Amino acid sequence: MKLFIITVVTILTISRVFDKTPATTEARKSKKMVGHEHFNEYLDPTFAGHTFGVVKEDFLEVKKLKKIGDENNLKNRFINEFAPTNPEDSLGIGHPRVLNNKFTNDFAPTNPGDSPGIRHPGVVNV
C-alpha cells in the first residue's frame, strides 16, 4: 500500500512540475511545403535524372519462352536449374547451365593488375 501511494504522489508531482499529464500525446498540424506537392499536375516522368513513372523506353524486348504441349514453360530457360557449372565443381546447387552457351574453364585476370584466378568462368556462345 505504501508503494502505491508513493507512485501516485510521484506521478502527480511530475505532472504538475512539467505541466503535462503523464499519458498524453500531442501532435501539431503538418505545414504545407511549397513545391513539394505529391500530385503535381506539371509532373514530367522523363525529366533528366528523375524517373517518377514507368516509361516505354525502360522495357527491353526479349525472346518468348519455348512451348511444351502448347503451353509456355518457365523451366525451359535452363537445362537443369540445380546443376554445377563445371565438372570439377561440387554437386548440388550452382549456377545453371544455359542452353545456348558453353562455360569455359578460363580463370585469367581481365585486366593487368587484377588478382589471377578468382572470378566467374567465361561464357562463350556456341
From Swiss-Prot:
Residue list for modification Hydroxyproline: P84, P87, P109, P112, P116
Q: Does the keyword Ribosomal protein apply?
A: no
Free-text tissue specificity from the UniProt record: Mostly expressed in roots. Present in cotyledons, shoot apical meristem (SAM), leaves, inflorescence stems and flowers.
Top-level taxon:
Eukaryota
List the GO terms this entry assigns under cellular component, sorted alphabetically.
apoplast
* Stated induction or repression of this protein's expression: Accumulates in shoots in response to nitrate depletion and to osmotic stress (e.g. mannitol), but repressed by ammonium chloride NH(4)Cl and nitrogen starvation.
Signal peptide from the UniProt entry: 1-19
Gene Ontology terms, MF aspect: hormone activity
Keyword list (alphabetical) reads: Apoplast, Developmental protein, Hormone, Hydroxylation, Secreted, Signal
InterPro entries linked:
CEP
Q: Coiled-coil annotation: which residues?
A: none
Q: Does the keyword Secreted apply?
A: yes
What does this protein's UniProt record list under function? Answer: Extracellular signaling peptide that represses primary root growth rate. Negatively regulates the number of leaves and flowering, and modulates leaf morphology. Regulates systemic nitrogen (N)-demand signaling. Mediates up-regulation of genes involved in N uptake and assimilation pathways.
PANTHER family annotated for this entry?
A: PRECURSOR OF CEP10-RELATED, PRECURSOR OF CEP5
The similarity comment for this entry is: Belongs to the C-terminally encoded plant signaling peptide (CEP) family.
Name under which the protein is recorded: Precursor of CEP2
**Which species expresses this protein natively?**
Arabidopsis thaliana (Mouse-ear cress)
